[in-house]
Design a protein with these regions (language model features):
Chain B
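Ubiquitin-like/PB1-type beta-grasp interaction modules and other compact soluble beta-rich domains
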Residues: 1-78
Length: 172, 80
């Protein structure tokens, strides 16, 4: 953000040029507020609505990563997964990752939707969608976002096996 | 000072609760907090690693804790 709304309205000199510049900046601000969507939800994620949201006439391509619940870990049958999040911090950390993606690549819209609660095999815990004018940026940013999310965002999953439950990655 | 510590994932099971209260000295650091917690809950030391968050940000061992800070134990994350 370049300046706040308060500064914007307290300007005392209005010229045509400054007004055009200010409208440009304001447009950028509004754009900044709508080029990112982050959601933590206990409800089923909607893949199509995520794709629709990142699509724009300026985009040349969209990259989507869809995580799915796998039926086994190291050969052992997984019955279901239970996701828990430290919600305010998870959202803050996801916002940081998205900002890093915008800083690193010329991407246009970025979306992260992540589930909480119990998911059955085949259900979708995470969707990442990125649009860009050219595919390299979309591929690279999408990969970066899911890889970083797995390292920094405070969300945990517990795998349910037939002989008990295990928090993933908790123990060496 | 008395502080509350939030626990998530496996830490919640180790504490037996999603919230524990601790008494710390006024200039206590993250390092001091971890030491105290590991004395009371030795199973914490068996984790692959764990971080402490203060007011929704990852904290460093030397960071000082203040009264009314929101403290959380962050065991290894596994989202996605």
């Amino acid at each position: 953000m370049i300046f706040g709304i308060k500064d914007y309205w307290s300007k005392d000199k209005w010229t045509k040029e400054s007004l055009i510049f200010d409208l440009f900046v304001l447009d950028q601000l509004i754009n900044d507020m709508t080029n990112t969507q982050i959601l933590l939800s206990a409800e089923t994620l909607n893949i199509q609505s995520c794709i629709d949201w990142v699509m724009s006439p300026e985009s040349g391509g969209i990259d989507v990563f869809i995580g799915t619940v796998r039926n086994a870990t190291k050969g052992k049958a997984v019955l279901k997964l239970d996701f828990e999040a430290y919600e305010p911090m998870a959202v803050t950390e996801m916002e940081k990752i998205v900002q890093q993606a915008f800083d690193k690549w010329p991407v246009q819209r970025v979306l992260i939707h992540h589930r909480t609660g119990v998911l059955q095999v085949g259900e979708v815990p995470v969707i990442i969608a990125v649009s860009a004018a050219h595919r390299d940026a979309a591929f690279d940013a999408c990969r970066y976002i899911i890889d970083t999310l797995k390292q920094t965002v405070p969300i945990w999953k517990k795998e349910a096996f037939e002989d008990g439950d295990i928090w993933v990655a908790a123990h060496p | 000072m008395k502080i509350n510590v939030l626990a998530f994932g496996v830490a919640k099971e180790i504490f037996g609760s999603s919230l524990v209260s601790l008494e710390l000295t006024n200039d206590a650091t993250i390092y001091n907090l971890k030491y105290l917690l590991e004395q009371q809950y030795p199973r914490l030391k068996q984790l692959a690693s764990y971080m402490v968050a203060v007011n929704n940000e990852y904290a460093l061992p030397g960071d000082t804790i203040h009264e009314r800070d929101e403290i959380a134990i962050i065991p290894p994350v596994s989202g996605g």
